[in-house]
Curated annotation (Swiss-Prot):
It comes from Burkholderia vietnamiensis (strain G4 / LMG 22486). Keywords: ATP-binding, Coenzyme A biosynthesis, Cytoplasm, Kinase, Nucleotide-binding, Potassium, Transferase. Its main location: cytoplasm. Pathway: Cofactor biosynthesis; coenzyme A biosynthesis; CoA from (R)-pantothenate: step 1/5. The gene is coaX. This is Type III pantothenate kinase.
Length: 262
């Protein structure tokens, strides 16, 4: 029986990991912060020895060094691969003019989405520090995407760059809107800011989905992922599917392809 793969998704806000067996089933998973101040280190002591680590890192060199230190402490000399977007991989063709410019997290997510929803046209919306959209045709062609500030970043920008508007977190904003979602307009400043930025997210998604369906002359499945997906979903008027495991699933496919090639 082959050893499992350790999968690591180092995003802008936190680091998620999973252990995938030979059937690409995630048998263990967790999350931790970029620094020790962000919470405890992952406890990998009970995990079986993986054959290697497959890493998507969009968080920079400091996080890469932290990951190396954690891996070396648990499994010295463990082989590790930091993935990069390619022109084509695992059934997905990259439509970027410079394929390597596409973030590794978005690339892994596209591969995961292609496997999760085969033979379907997809719009994948991920709500993190940034809100990203990817258009993926049923034949596996990624035709392009959009990047916008995330919900939290929108609200933080308004609070930081204006004199009288508050700086709100998504937790606070979500609570403010919990009793006000039926109202299209709000009657105080914190709720107006929370709802305005949330509707900006929803409006972007709905416009992109309608434009994509019109351009392709076919139905498009809207797939939502990320920390703010629940809040944005409640503001949407379009049908949608929630799937938060696309990046790790994509990493599992990339790891399996690499192991088969080796």
């Amino acid at each position: 029986m082959s050893a499992p793969h350790l999968l690591i998704d180092a995003g802008n806000s936190r680091i998620k990991w999973a252990l995938a067996d030979a059937q690409r089933t995630l048998v263990a998973s967790g999350a931790f912060g970029h620094t020790r101040d962000g919470g405890a280190d992952p406890d990998w002591s009970a995990l079986p020895h993986p054959q290697g680590a497959w890493i998507s890192n969009v968080a920079g060199a400091d996080v890469a060094a932290r990951l190396d230190a954690l891996l070396d402490a648990q499994w010295p000399a463990l082989p590790r691969t930091t993935i990069r977007a390619r022109a084509a991989q695992c059934g997905v063709t990259n439509g970027y003019t410079s394929p390597e410019q596409l973030g590794s997290d978005r690339w892994a997510g596209l591969i995961g989405a292609r496997a999760a929803f085969p033979d379907e046209h997809l719009l994948i919306a991920t709500f993190g520090t940034a809100t990203t959209l990817e258009a993926l045709r049923a034949d596996g062609r990624f035709t392009g995407g959009l990047i916008a500030p995330g919900w939290a970043l929108m609200m933080r920008a308004l609070g930081t760059h204006t004199a009288q508007l508050p700086t709100l977190s998504t937790d606070i904003a979500s609570g403010l809107l919990a009793d006000a979602r039926a109202e299209p307009f709000q009657i105080d400043t914190p709720r107006s800011l929370s709802a305005g930025c949330l509707y900006a997210q929803a409006g972007l998604i709905e416009r992109a989905c309608r434009d994509l369906a019109a351009a392709w002359q076919a139905p498009v499945r809207l797939v939502l992922a990320g920390g703010a997906a629940d809040d944005v979903a409640r503001a949407l008027t379009l049908p949608h599917t929630r799937h938060d495991g696309l990046i790790l699933s994509g990493l599992a496919l990339i790891a399996a392809e690499g192991a088969a090639r080796d």
